Amino acid sequence: MPRYDAIVVICDNEDDHQILLRGLDEWFSEIDAFGDGVILGAARMDAREIPLPHNVVAFGDDGDRVGSFYAGDGILQLLTDAGGRIWISYFDEASYGFAKPDGTLGVSYMPGLARWDGIGSDPWFAYSDTGNQVGWCDCYAVNVGRTLVYACPYVDFPLVEIDASGVRSITPNPITRCTGLAVSNSRFDFFDHYRQNDAPVWSIRKGLREGGVVTETGREILTLPGSRSPTGWARGKIGRDGTLWLHEDGNPRQWYRYEIDS
């Protein structure tokens, strides 16, 4: 594709900082803060040979590139944490290419969820810790908090708790069909959307984790400011501890914040 320039605007309360990025060569659909700069990810990447093309690129606050790496095809979300680690979830069509011992291209499928400890580090994949206890067909929901990460992968939606060292626990979860997640200690709010009477509905199913199980404790239909019902599917679905950020399909400039009850 033709190279293009872009401007990133980072907002912090009433302050904002603009970063000019020059010569971008991929369609980057994912973005997050990374140090004083930003990191971008291209969701689709056709890798056919070694060396593998890079589809995640980091920039400093001056717009200069500080590094890049290959992160596979089929990225669902790219999120960074307070320690500078990079978390990437994948949808069901995802694949991850690698160099086999003979130097040719090998491909693995449905990687689910991966973590990089920094630019250029080797990836860690959640399936390496969970084995066949968890199916990572599609990482429907992920919440990257300050110290812990939670994921609910399709098809069984177990609640997988992860830290910087790996998987801490796998909890059976009766609340299936969740595409977003807000977390506060042992309380979990599972977001989903569906169509009812030809109109989109955004909903929350509340869960409590105790004694190694998740129990559903309530349900809630969400409305937008002004008691307005959403007009489209929810997009974004960025979970940060007790906060879930959402926007309506087709309107990525207007975001809404859901907070788990304190």
Q: What is the role of each PLM region?
A:
Residues 4-12, 52-63, 102-120, 201-210:
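Beta-propeller blade signature
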Residues 235-262:
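Blade-level signature of beta-propeller repeat domains, shared across WD40, Kelch, NHL, RCC1
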Residues 38-40, 86, 149, 188-190, ...:
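Hydrophobic beta-strand positions that form the internal "hydrophobic ladder"
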Residues 43-46, 91-93, 155, 194, ...:
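Residue-level signature of beta-propeller blades and closely related beta-rich strand-turn architectures
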Residues 22-36, 70-83, 132-142, 173-193, ...:
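Repeated scaffold domains used in trafficking and secretory/extracellular systems
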Residues 1-45:
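Blade-loop segments of beta-propeller domains
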Residues 15-23, 63-70, 122-133, 166-172, ...:
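A short beta-strand motif characteristic of beta-propeller blades
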Residues 1, 41-51, 88-110:
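Short, conserved, GDST-rich strand-edge loop motifs in beta-rich repeat architectures
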